[in-house]
Structures are given as structure tokens and as C-alpha cells.
Amino acid sequence: MDRLAARKNELAIVHQTGERDYNAVRTAYARREINAEVVPFLTNMPERFAWADIIVCRAGAITAAEIAAAGRAAIFIPFGRATDSHQLRNAQEMFRAGAGRLISEAELTPEKLTSEIFSLLDQPQDIEKLSTAARELARPHAARDIVNLIEEAANVQANRQRATA
């Protein structure tokens, strides 16, 4: 947090903590005089994502899809005990596509995280590359496309049944 404090005037931080860690995190920022909006839970994620230049987050499927839909640069920290390592796999896919950075829980230290954050802030073109790659992964019409595929399959099946009748 000391590196954050040194550059605190360059940053606008929103930190979702969950109920359990709220007081400790809020106190840590206050102790270093870092102005951060610390909240147990965020609402209106599309608005929050649109506001952010960099999102530091877990790597659940919904989060990865929201990052892609928002077209935002992300640093993924997959939950290490997620079932079948699905968060790690999601983060690896985003990383391979150039749509995010990846720090495993085993590698996570305050220094590593702040290094990744400032690496991006110091190279705005890297933020843009990650954002563009994330946006390219977005499937905003996925529900419609799935419905179309189901209808297409149903029509093929109905046509086969008519042909054999």
C-alpha cells in the first residue's frame, strides 16, 4: 500500500471488500491517507466498470463476461480453491487472448499487485490493448444467438420428421 500512497493523487480507487474485511480495508486506506471508496458490496456493475480504467478482480465466468462486455483492462486474481480450478482457466483464457493480466493467489503479494497496476498506468497503450482485446471477446447477443441455434435445430428436426412421415 505504500506505493499506492506515494501516487495517491493519481488514483481514484473503488474497493469492494465484502462485509468481513470492510473495516480493516477502510482503516488501511485511511491510515495511509489514500482517498478510496471502500464498500462491502457494489451495485450497478456496468456503470462501475465503465468508470474504471483498470479492474482488479476474481475470474468467475460472469466477471470475465462483464469485463469483456465493458471492454475494460483487468488484472485477474483467480480464487485458488474454485471448483475444478475454473477461475484459473477463465483467467488463463483472458490472458491468452490479451484481454487481461493474471496473478495467481500463490504469486499474489502487495508488491506484485501494485507493480502490475503501475505497469499499466505508466503504459496507457497497454490499458488500451487489454481493453480492445476484452471487447473483442464480448458476445453481447449471446442469448439471441443461442435461441436462434435452438430454433434452427428444432426446425431441422421437424423437417426430418416430416420427410420420414
Map each language-model feature to its residues.
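Donor-nucleotide binding loops and adjacent catalytic segments primarily
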Residues: 1-55, 88-92, 96, 103-113
